[in-house]
Amino acid sequence: MLVVGSELQSDAQQLSAEAPRHGELQYLRQVEHILRCGFKKEDRTGTGTLSVFGMQARYSLRDEFPLLTTKRVFWKGVLEELLWFIKGSTNAKELSSKGVRIWDANGSRDFLDSLGFSARQEGDLGPVYGFQWRHFGAEYKDMDSDYSGQGVDQLQKVIDTIKTNPDDRRIIMCAWNPKDLPLMALPPCHALCQFYVVNGELSCQLYQRSGDMGLGVPFNIASYALLTYMIAHITGLQPGDFVHTLGDAHIYLNHIEPLKIQLQREPRPFPKLKILRKVETIDDFKVEDFQIEGYNPHPTIKMEMAV
């Protein structure tokens, strides 16, 4: 049956009433569920996890930015990494030079050698996210090669389609390239995102095949929310929702106790994100264009990264 007018409004109000009073509670409930019901599984890193398959959360971007508050999230890292992706860079040292060392372990000499990439320079991650976003299908040589005009620029294609055909159901960017997987230091965890335009708002849904709930997921939520803000800004839209779909949602066994501490904390209001100048193209964004206002998180909780 077609739902129109007041019926549609009633449905929207019901959905709103069912949503938690604070978006962060969705994340905390996911963590609680995994701790309570997760299956114990071995994993690539040898650390061990509690895991469930299939979770989803919806974060409003309309008047707030979902930077979690029950612990401090590394905002500088979120911003610098996303700009690094947008550049198409696959050089971990480039990011590290800006004080963001989240890719250092995967680009280390020992790690690359363990994967059989002995001929590759240290820091060369292979055709990971940025390469797939901007040069999908091009032949990867090394992190220093110039790939201008090679492959499919998925990110620009997303932006162009939003501008010219916003009702298109194919506004998709995919980092999962089976041909290139053997060349990557780490295959994509956040594999595919789709954009959706309605009533002047831009929403994004991410499919994340693998979600490290302690360290990775808070970072990923903020990263794709930021990407949505950036694309909305360029295309003259307002940010709508970020829908986060998880495949294997897991908690590393050495993160259980830190996450129990986090669960005891009450979420504080999400901050706001301001873009400080008019930016015309996705490649023109700079670190200084963004300002987070009203971010008052609980203290940092230390968790070790599984490599």
From Swiss-Prot:
Keyword Signal: no
The protein's Enzyme Commission number: 2.1.1.45
UniProt binding sites for (6R)-5,10-methylene-5,6,7,8-tetrahydrofolate: 212, 306
Cross-link for Glycyl lysine isopeptide (Lys-Gly) (interchain with G-Cter in SUMO2), residue positions: 286, 302
Subcellular location: Nucleus; Cytoplasm; Mitochondrion; Mitochondrion matrix
Taxonomy, superkingdom: Eukaryota
Top enzyme class: transferase
Pathway: Pyrimidine metabolism; dTTP biosynthesis
Active site per the UniProt annotation: 189
Assigned GO CC terms: cytoplasm; mitochondrial inner membrane; mitochondrial matrix; mitochondrion; nucleus
Alphabetical list of HAMAP family matching this protein: Thymidy_synth_bact
UniProt record similarity statement: Belongs to the thymidylate synthase family.
Physiological role: Catalyzes the reductive methylation of 2'-deoxyuridine 5'-monophosphate (dUMP) to thymidine 5'-monophosphate (dTMP), using the cosubstrate, 5,10- methylenetetrahydrofolate (CH2H4folate) as a 1-carbon donor and reductant and contributes to the de novo mitochondrial thymidylate biosynthesis pathway.
Record's subunit section: Homodimer.
Protein name: Thymidylate synthase
Native source organism of the sequence: Mus musculus
Gene assigned in the entry: Tyms
